[in-house]
Amino acid sequence: MAAKDIRFGEDARTRMVRGVNVLANAVKATLGPKGRNVVLEKSFGAPTITKDGVSVAKEIELADKFENMGAQMVKEVASKTNDNAGDGTTTATVLAQALIREGAKAVAAGMNPMDLKRGIDQAVKAAVIELKNISKPTTDDKAIAQVGTISANSDESIGNIIAEAMQKVGKEGVITVEEGSGLENELDVVEGMQFDRGYLSPYFINNQQSQSADLDDPFILLHDKKISNVRDLLPVLEGVAKAGKPLLIVAEEVEGEALATLVVNTIRGIVKVVAVKAPGFGDRRKAMLEDMAVLTGGTVISEEVGLALEKATIKDLGRAKKVQVSKENTTIIDGAGDSATIEARVGQIKTQIEDTSSDYDREKLQERVAKLAGGVAVIKVGASTEIEMKEKKARVEDALHATRAAVEEGVVPGGGVALVRALVAVGNLTGANEDQTHGIQIALRAMEAPLREIVANAGEEPSVILNKVKEGTGNYGYNAANGEFGDMVEFGILDPTKVTRSALQNAASIAGLMITTEAMVADAPKKDEPAMPAGGGMGGMGGMDF
């Protein structure tokens, strides 16, 4: 086992705080509408230019192991806030730095670290309750657009496109972000349920222009096994032909005689049919077929539940207003399922999302919710260079997370104002002893830090602006973008409550751990062994000419 380097007490905390300051100073430069850019070197290719706090934090590794431990712990604050709320990483870092710096000073002055931590925790608890009281629900598209704009560093086009996407696919809908091919941002919306399986034969195509098979008001047969014998399908085909409607067959596989018969019937115009493979594999396939059944008001024909294909009737089939089948995708639009049943199914899947620990499973379950709840929107980010594209895509993803958080827990006035307003609730607290009260005071000063940093980045004097904001009430604050004072909600400067809350709670959590740290252990630096001296010539061979 390698030897360890151990530091205690003040020496350990000083080094740790030094690391915190290095990371926080780099990250906080990006805060606010007038935040600066940070350039990140890449091991290959052009450097990345970003105003995203978590991207900056992730790049930082320090040479001194003890300083690096401090930096890594604050990096954890940024990452955790990003995971919880999708934004607020820079705010969380600024709060953590303020709490740790003041806390370390208090410990150096001889105060009890545990009492300081208790005081900070008490203050944060009161501040979170006050934030929830200040919070207003997000209902209209305008508020959603404003939240997106602020999170995307005041880029209105990003805020508007996110609001439009949410309007089209609903609050539960899946919105994904991709790199586009043009200069402008584009929104592509797929309504209804789409899955990545196309027609099994090109003879099913009935729309030559789009090279797709379009079915209006079709019946939908869902089966979880292979269909190779046409006799099994006859009762269903006869029923559909009598009704004079087209038919979509979704099964594990349609092959051989069954597929040939369907193609012949379609070409002759006897019955319009399209066959596609069921999406997914194994249990996921069964679950997706069940989702389709709920969406279309049909039943999955499965021997597991005692339903045989040859016994199926037209009553077991689902319905939809329209189905479009291309070479690669099938889209079911406006299924005839009962809305209460669909909602119950969505609730069931959401419970599974909460229970799963796998990110992959969670993503797939969220996709299923979206397909049942309304559709999928794809935001295609446009830019003129690859560097700009990467930076813009990161901002769009941040803004999207922030708007989701706003829909979830509501919004508070932005620009650091919400934390300043929460000071009132914290200011009335007193601790069980003097050290705890000092912990509360540390939290009070730290909660001013985000506003101070936004103002400093805008080139103004933080204390002057802060005092003026404190004199106001409610949404009154400072718009750093144009230097005006006024109602932050009217200015459109809003922060999701979840983002501000997560930033404060995560910062306090790490600060509490660091203040109460008394020893640090790291691998001792290895001393390089001197290289062996170069060997001379062989003895007894003098005089030989080499």
UniProtKB/Swiss-Prot annotation:
Residues 526-546 are annotated as: Disordered. One of its GO terms (biological process) is protein refolding. The keyword Repressor does not apply. PROSITE patterns: CHAPERONINS_CPN60. It comes from the Bacteria. It catalyses: ATP + H2O + a folded polypeptide = ADP + phosphate + an unfolded polypeptide. It is found in: Cytoplasm. Its EC number is 5.6.1.7. Residues 534-546 have a biased composition (Gly residues). One of its GO terms (molecular function) is ATP binding. It is an enzyme of class 5 (isomerase). Signal peptide: none annotated. Keywords: ATP-binding, Chaperone, Cytoplasm, Isomerase, Nucleotide-binding. Together with its co-chaperonin GroES, plays an essential role in assisting protein folding. The GroEL-GroES system forms a nano-cage that allows encapsulation of the non-native substrate proteins and provides a physical environment optimized to promote and accelerate protein folding. Forms a cylinder of 14 subunits composed of two heptameric rings stacked back-to-back. Interacts with the co-chaperonin GroES. NCBIfam families: GroEL, PRK00013.1, PRK12849.1, PRK12850.1, PRK12851.1. Belongs to the chaperonin (HSP60) family. This is Chaperonin GroEL. It comes from Xanthomonas campestris pv. campestris (strain ATCC 33913 / DSM 3586 / NCPPB 528 / LMG 568 / P 25). The lineage of its organism: Bacteria, Pseudomonadati, Pseudomonadota, Gammaproteobacteria, Lysobacterales.
